[in-house]
Amino acid sequence: MAAELEPLMAEWLGAEKAEDTRGQAASLNTMEDLLETVKKLQKEGSLEPQIEDLIHRINELQQGPAKKRSSEELGEAQALQEAMHRELDSLNEERVHLEEVLRKKQEAVSILKKHPQERDSDTPHLDAQQLEERLADLARQHKDLWEFHVLQQRLAQEISTMEHRKDQLLAERTLLRARLEKVEQRLQEARETWDSPGNCGLKTELEELEGQSQRSPEAQNDKGEASQEEQHHLETSEELPRTGTLC
């Protein structure tokens, strides 16, 4: 059985050398030590009891650091491959973007080259009369723009003046209404106390009030609402009965 084990060990050692060529010096030394141990035990005649131990150690060596290192290297290679694929995809996207930018720039350059040619081809056809017409047209446009600007400023100034005048008129109207209401109130009081005995100076006071109401600017304006009311009250006061004894 020892004779059968020795070729098996040699075959496994050769396969192990073919599989792992990176840093397997320690494992090879261990296998050589095992072979030496097998030969030594064969000479001593005590090989049979330790065959199972040798097989167990061989299995451990097969599944030991070499296999682990190979798995780690395989994982690193796969990770590197994925990273390279991602980088390749990114480079492809960048290439597409740069090609698009290059295409747009080439189109812009082509347009810029085409326009000067068109201007150069149109220039000889322009004579002095056309140039004068263009200059006159530009002058008219400039004049119209300036007149519009001046008119706009003038309108803004007039609007501001009108707004100020409007505020003044509103203030005057408010003041006149207050004065008119005061006069109407005094007229109403005079009408209520007209026939009351003991009011000697009532007629004189009423005439003064009527004179004040007639002298007010609001009474002279026939179109104003307040003047119409005042005229109505004045006419009513004139139609009051003037009976009784006055002092």
From Swiss-Prot:
InterPro entries: SYCE1 (IPR026676)
This protein's record includes keyword Coiled coil: yes
A GO CC term assigned to this protein in UniProt: synaptonemal complex
Record's keyword terms, sorted: Coiled coil, Meiosis
Bias (Basic and acidic residues): 220-241
Tissue expression from the record: Isoform 1 is abundantly expressed in testis and weakly in ovary, it is not found in other tissues. Isoform 2 is expressed in testis and poorly in brain, heart, lung and other examined tissues.
Biological function: May be involved in meiosis. Isoform 1 may be involved in meiosis during spermatogenesis while isoform 2 is probably related to a later stage of meiosis, in the development stage of secondary spermatocytes and spermatids.
Protein name: Synaptonemal complex central element protein 1-like
Example GO BP: synaptonemal complex assembly
Coiled coil: 71-196
Entry's family note: Belongs to the SYCE family.
Higher taxonomy: Eukaryota, Metazoa, Chordata, Craniata, Vertebrata
Annotated region (Disordered), positions in chain: 189-247
Domain of life: Eukaryota
